[in-house]
Regions:
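C-terminal/domain-edge helix-coil "capping" segments
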Residues: 24-30, 169-208
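N-terminal segment of the mature soluble domain
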Residues: 49-118
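Bacterial N-terminal signal peptides that target proteins for export
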Residues: 1-12
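Surface-exposed short loop/turn segments
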Residues: 24-41, 47, 103-152
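Soluble periplasmic/extracytoplasmic beta-strand elements of cell-envelope proteins
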Residues: 50-55, 68-70, 122-126, 139-145, ...
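C-terminal motif of bacterial Sec signal peptides marking the signal peptidase cleavage site
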Residues: 19-22
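Short secondary-structure boundary motifs at beta->alpha junctions and helix caps
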Residues: 76-83, 151-191
């Protein structure tokens, strides 16, 4: 083997080693929006209805496994090394369902045969914005509607909310802020669900 060939081979080997080293130095971190199961149940009586949490609508640019964060006023970054365990829409539905089941003391029958002797409240959530600024804050803007399939004319309650949650630390703190924002949203939906079940004249809970 000539000197130039050996030198070329060494250069290629060094390049491969550096590439493998770079890959090894950047582990992928996975996150979930579902809060820990050890949270206390609601002190209120169990709701006399089941719920059906429908798939959550999410802006197309956010509905992926890679975390998407804001940079300044108009920039975004797609973080391939900071990822959700499932696409964001699935994570949001799972997190919302978990919160509502705990707060209402009921069951989410999505994907199951509907109970015969219990009304089922359908809940639909559409995320309009979910902006995350690392080291700063999370802003959530969403619309939701709820209604009982048994109601005549399909009457539903439709509401809107905007939330902001501080996120002063790293990516784990950013995820925690998003969990808290979803929990706050679930609290408002819970109030409206209980109110709507008692009276179809119930309006949306005012924002604090």
């Amino acid at each position: 083997m000539s000197f130039s060939a050996r030198a070329c081979l060494r250069a290629v080997s060094l390049t491969v080693a550096l590439a493998l080293s770079a890959c090894a130095s950047a582990p992928v971190h996975y996150y979930t929006l579902v809060s820990p199961a050890a949270q206390p149940a609601s002190a209120q009586p169990a709701a006399p209805f089941a719920i059906d949490v429908l798939p959550v609508g999410v802006p197309a640019e956010l509905d992926q496994q890679a975390m998407v964060v804001r940079q300044g006023d108009s920039g975004v970054a797609v973080l391939d090394d900071e990822r959700w365990v499932a696409p964001l829409g699935d994570q949001l539905r799972a997190a919302l369902s978990t919160q509502l089941v705990r707060r209402l003391g009921t069951q989410d029958v999505a994907g199951l045969t509907r109970p015969v002797n219990q009304p089922v409240l359908g809940i639909r959530l559409q995320i309009r914005r979910l902006d995350a600024w690392p080291g700063h804050a999370v802003q959530l803007e969403a619309d939701w509607s709820l209604g009982f399939a048994q109601d005549p004319n399909g009457v539903r309650l439709t509401c809107h909310t905007q939330l902001q949650q501080a996120a002063p630390g790293g990516y784990a703190d950013l995820v925690r802020a998003q969990q808290l924002a979803i929990a706050s949203l679930a609290g408002r939906i819970t109030e409206d669900a209980r109110g709507w079940a008692q009276s179809r004249q119930h309006g949306c809970t005012p924002q604090a």
